Design a protein with these regions (language model features):
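Solvent-exposed loop and beta-edge segments used for protein-protein assembly and interaction
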Residues: 29, 173-175, 261
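Internal maturation/activation junctions in enzymes
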Residues: 9-14, 34-82
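Short acidic, low-complexity intrinsically disordered linear motifs used
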Residues: 253-275
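Short beta-strand-initiation
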Residues: 72-75, 176, 262
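Conserved phosphate/anionic-ligand binding catalytic regions in large, soluble enzymes, centered on
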Residues: 24-39, 73-100, 268
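Catalytic alpha/beta core of large soluble enzyme barrels
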Residues: 1-14, 21-24, 82, 91-257
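Conserved short loop/turn motifs at secondary-structure junctions
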Residues: 19-24, 42, 46-54, 181-185
Length: 275
């Protein structure tokens, strides 16, 4: 499908150089997600052979279809994306990241002009006005439970995260894997040394302090098992009638889906549809 899509290079409002570059490279993004949920692919040793074999299949498939279409083969195909949206839909660990906690509240922000926002409010999904934009953004909260024996954010060190990233950078990705590393206070010196030693390949990596601090309406908020049960009892919904969306969706309004990105104490509403 991606190879077919790479033929769509008629950019009406961009310079010819962009069209030429796109036709020359035809970059694809065949990504893996749920990596930390997999018993083999989450390991730094056992996964290498499998990753190289899967990468070869992706490359050969693109080559075969490109030859059939009479277009150049893509110069880069495989990657690891953050996968925030897909992972939520299929209940998988996000990209190459561990799951947040055994039990947590996941908040999602919606533009009040978005029909989906109004639909969820009407269906009784727990919601409250966004603290920063109370007149235009609504925050929905969902109680989440990780699977048994899931790898959690607190189970692995920063260096273990980086070493797994390196395996994927060398044995799977033609692009660079995207990852955000949670770093405990006592780990920063070791992390700095690792980056220095791997400077030639270290890109696509972000670092955030590993913190148990939870602020109001944070995207992920740790809760205990009892709180999870209470949330489900009071606000849990399993009988949402999605056919009613047609009553709200009268026009194309795809720019309304938004999620809050928070780093260094600053939060920004990000348009999910732009990615």
């Amino acid at each position: 499908l991606g190879t077919l899509q790479s033929t769509l290079t008629d950019f009406k409002y961009l310079r010819k150089i962009w069209k030429d570059n796109t036709e020359e490279e035809r970059l694809l993004g065949v990504s893996l997600t749920g990596i930390m949920d997999h018993s083999v692919l989450s390991k730094t040793v056992d996964s290498r052979v499998w990753l190289e074999e899967m990468r070869e299949v992706a490359i050969e498939t693109n080559k075969t279809i490109a030859n059939t279409l009479g277009i150049p083969q893509s110069t880069a195909i495989t990657c690891v994306k953050p996968s925030g949206t897909v992972s939520q839909l299929v209940d998988a660990a996000s990209g190459i990241h561990a799951r947040h906690n055994d039990y947590y509240i996941r908040t999602v922000r919606g533009d009040n002009k978005d029909p989906l926002t109004q639909f969820l409010i009407g269906e009784g999904i727990y919601n409250e006005p966004d603290m920063m934009k109370p007149d235009s953004v609504t925050v929905f909260s969902f109680p989440m439970q990780s699977p048994d024996r899931a790898v959690l954010r607190g189970d692995i060190t920063a260096i273990e995260q980086l070493e797994l990233w390196k395996v994927y950078a060398l044995h799977w990705c033609e692009h660079k894997p995207s990852v955000t590393i949670s770093v405990r206070e006592e780990e920063w010196m070791d992390v700095g040394a690792w980056v220095y030693e791997n400077f030639d390949i270290a890109s696509g990596v972000s670092f955030l302090p590993h913190s148990n601090h939870t602020y109001q309406q944070a995207p992920y908020q740790d809760i205990e098992y009892e709180e999870y049960l209470e949330w489900n009892m009071r606000y849990g919904r399993t009988n949402i009638d999605w056919t009613k969306m047609t009553e709200f969706e009268k026009e194309d309004n795809t720019t309304g889906s938004r999620e809050l990105a928070c780093t260094a104490g600053v939060c920004e509403v990000v348009d999910l549809s732009a990615g």
